[in-house]
Curated annotation (Swiss-Prot):
Assembly and interaction partners: Heterodimer of sae1 and sae2. The complex binds sumo via sae2.
EC number assigned by the record: 2.3.2.-
Main localization category: nucleus
One GO term (biological process): protein sumoylation
UniProt function note: The dimeric enzyme acts as an E1 ligase for sumo. It mediates ATP-dependent activation of sumo and formation of a thioester with a conserved cysteine residue on sae2.
Protein name: SUMO-activating enzyme subunit 2
Family: Belongs to the ubiquitin-activating E1 family.
Basic and acidic residues bias: start-end ranges: 548-563
Gene3D superfamilies cross-referenced by the UniProt entry: Ubiquitin activating enzymes (Uba3). Chain: B, domain 2 (1.10.10.520), Ubiquitin-activating enzyme E1, inactive adenylation domain, subdomain 1 (3.50.50.80), Ubiquitin-like 2 activating enzyme e1b. Chain: B, domain 3 (3.10.290.20)
Keyword Metal-binding on entry: yes
Region (Disordered): 545-661
InterPro entries with a match to the protein in the record: ThiF/MoeB/HesA, ThiF_NAD_FAD-bd, UAE_UbL_dom, Ub-E1_IAD_1, Ub_act_enz_dom_a_sf, Uba2, UBA_E1_SCCH, Ubiquitin-activating_enz
Length: 661
């Protein structure tokens, strides 16, 4: 044993190594970061390790989760990770748990036994849960994550640093479908549109991506959705000519010329902005265009092929080629509907090229294939080397914690490109946020209509979705009015609870200025909520506010945009760390999540991100973007990295991330 770890003892000293050997570690998550972390822990000398992971191994994991092989597909990640990592040292004591970390068996009593918890998770819900449990039993935790080429490691300790929930959690932003179809203003709008086009051309008749996709001939309709009343639009005779020349020319002319001309003839859309420009295919194909390599020169040295942005002409050529090949596949399968898949190279190239062409039409910056993949699937591509770097940084911080050198612990951020001469940026740990409702157990206020909001709505949207309470127990005074969880309830009690859920808050004495105590025993969590009755979120009130906003915008010459989440909002929380907004590829009629299929099959509660990378938040001003590198700032507001709004990183500014395994 001493010979195996002689280099570790020489570097750290015998005393520190003895602490490493005797401490007990919990690793939550055995995916991309988890595999690297487990290997590093064993090679460093950690002997007593527990692993928790609910997921099973999918073929898509094998390119980066190196502890798994093809023969392991369908098996427990935690158990196979244990078997594989023990080949490095058979004398380590590893216990694998194939289960959900949020289940009652992994409560506060379970967490008490560990000296340190390491998160290698891929979703916010589980992160919040582990954060609360570690705070409740005063066990230090190391939080980590990656997002493509970006990564972060940070140490959390009760009473000494900010917790995971001290900073705002990004919430998805939704786009109105009319914005996507008629008035795009950002790359994500064009990417969602391109996915909708794929569904319309090749998807099932009721494809979520494209709405009405009853047949390919639907594209021959010369009036786009929402403009049927514009009778002054002339029929495009060239469309018929292009149709005679072939399918791909017809589609191109229809969506990039005919439909754009229709939009141009809607002057109200373009009062305060430049109208789109319709395209003519022959003019584009005959043009000469400077390549990106000639424009950027040495800057391309740091870019991989998928990161290089195609020229406009290249996008057109790729679009036509993909369209032809997809049509052939569609015909050869007897018109069997296709589903867009981020890992299908042809389908991805189609969406990338189509979205970039549309971006060019509307004067929006085009994106690389790498960025489009990240945004189109609302995922962050997994990069094995990033996971490896973060896995190493976790162990470096773990050694400090175990050795009692907590004052030396740091948050370290991994950048995509050198900042100065550094890819790694260490910073001091942030102190507690005094307004955090988790680690400071503060009170919060919830404003809603108590006469219309049901107990079920309050639990699902306010407690579970917004406050991440899994199994709430609601108490008013000395009376328990609701108890979550099914473990100890009889069938009759469950039926009775179902009846309670359908009743409004007011019928249970939850009226204006009522003090409600919410507990979750599994999280060892408690919070007091002051209920305030308001009609601000009633439909009539919201309609009035919209009308007033519209009139105000018209006077100021602005375009009124009402986001769907504002339409659906029925409550407001005051006193909780405010939320930032991130964009997801969703519309008022569709949800474009396209989660990793393995994540869906195995119920690991991923939040629309590819399994290894997860959520990465930056300390920056709130932004409505999607995922990639972004310019960090010293301000303490976290946002989800937008792979679509890629910007340069500045060494004087600080990244903050929470990602996934």
């Amino acid at each position: 044993m001493s010979e195996r770890y002689s280099h570790i003892i020489q570097a750290l000293g015998q005393s520190t190594f003895d602490k490493i050997q005797t401490c007990k570690i919990l690793v939550v998550g055995a995916g991309g970061i988890g595999c690297e972390l487990l290997k590093n822990l064993v090679l460093t000398g950690f002997k007593n390790i527990d692993i928790i992971d609910l997921d099973t191994i999918d073929i898509s994991n094998l390119n980066r989760q190196f502890l798994f092989r093809k023969q392991h597909i369908g098996m427990s990640k935690a158990k196979i990770a244990k078997e594989s990592v023990m080949k490095y040292n058979e004398q380590v004591n590893i216990t694998a748990h194939h289960g959900d970390v949020k289940s009652s068996e992994f409560g506060s009593e379970f967490f008490k036994q560990f000296d340190l918890v390491m998160n290698a998770l891929d979703n916010i819900s589980a992160r919040r849960h582990v954060n609360r449990l570690c705070l409740s039993v005063d066990v230090p935790m190391i939080e980590s994550g990656t997002a493509g080429y970006l990564g972060q490691v940070s140490v959390i300790r009760k009473g000494k640093t900010e917790c995971f929930e001290c900073q705002p959690i990004a919430v998805p932003k939704q786009f109105a479908v009319c914005t996507i179809r008629t008035n795009p203003s950002a790359p994500i709008h064009c990417i969602v549109w391109a996915k909708m086009l794929f569904g319309k051309l090749f998807g099932p008749k009721d494809d979520d991506g494209g709405g009405d996709s009853s047949s390919l001939t639907d594209l021959d309709n010369n009036i786009i959705h929402g403009t049927e009343e514009l009778g002054n639009i002339k029929r495009d005779e060239q469309l018929l000519i292009e149709k005679e020349k072939g399918f791909k020319r017809w589609v191109f002319h229809k969506i990039f010329h005919t439909d754009i001309e229709t939009l141009i003839h809607m002057p109200d859309l373009w009062k305060d902005k430049q109208p789109p420009t319709s395209l003519k295919l022959d003019e584009i194909l005959s043009s000469k265009e400077v390549s990106q390599a000639e424009e950027e020169g040495d800057q391309l040295i740091f870019k991989l092929p998928d990161q290089k942005q195609w020229t406009f002409k290249e996008n057109v050529e790729v679009f036509l080629d993909c369209l032809e090949k997809l049509k052939q596949q569609f015909d050869q399968s007897n018109s069997k509907p296709m589903t867009w898949d981020k890992d299908d190279e042809l389908a991805l190239s189609f969406v990338c090229s189509a979205s970039n062409i549309r971006s060019k039409i509307f004067g929006i910056p085009m994106k690389s294939r790498f960025d489009v993949k990240s945004m189109a699937g609302n995922i962050i591509p997994a990069i094995a080397t990033t996971n490896a770097v973060i896995g190493g940084l976790i162990v470096m911080e773990a050694i400090k914690v175990v050795d009692g050198r907590f004052d030396q612990c740091l948050s370290t951020y991994l950048y995509q490109l050198p900042s100065g001469k550094r890819l790694l940026m260490p910073t001091q740990l942030e102190p507690q946020n005094p307004k955090c409702f988790v680690c400071n157990r503060s009170f919060i206020i919830c404003r809603l209509n108590t006469e219309k909001t049901t107990i079920s709505q309050f639990i699902d949207h306010v407690l579970k979705k917004s406050l991440a309470v899994n199994e709430p127990i609601l108490t008013v005074g000395n009376d328990i009015i609701y108890e979550g969880g099914d473990q100890d309830l009889s069938k009759e009690e469950i039926e009775q609870r179902s009846k309670i859920e359908k009743k409004t808050l007011a019928t249970h004495r939850l009226t204006n200025d009522t003090s409600l105590v919410v507990e979750d025993y599994n999280q060892d969590f408690q919070i007091t909520i002051t209920i305030q009755h308001t009609t601000d979120f009633d439909e009539d009130t919201k309609k009035l506010k919209k009308q007033q906003q519209k009139e105000k915008d018209q006077k100021e010459g602005k375009t009124t945009t009402i986001e769907k989440e504002e339409d659906d909002k029925f409550f407001e929380i005051i006193g909780k760390t405010s939320q930032t907004t991130t964009t997801t590829t969703t519309t008022t009629t569709t949800t474009e999540s396209d989660n990793n299929s393995n994540n869906n099959k195995n119920n690991n509660n991923n939040n629309d991100v590819e399994e290894d990378d997860g959520f990465m938040f930056i300390e920056d001003q709130p932004s409505s973007t999607t995922t990639s590198s972004a310019t960090p700032s010293i301000s303490k507001k976290r946002k989800e990295i937008d792979t679509n709004e890629s910007e340069d990183l500045d060494s004087s500014k600080k990244l903050k991330s929470n990602l996934q395994d």
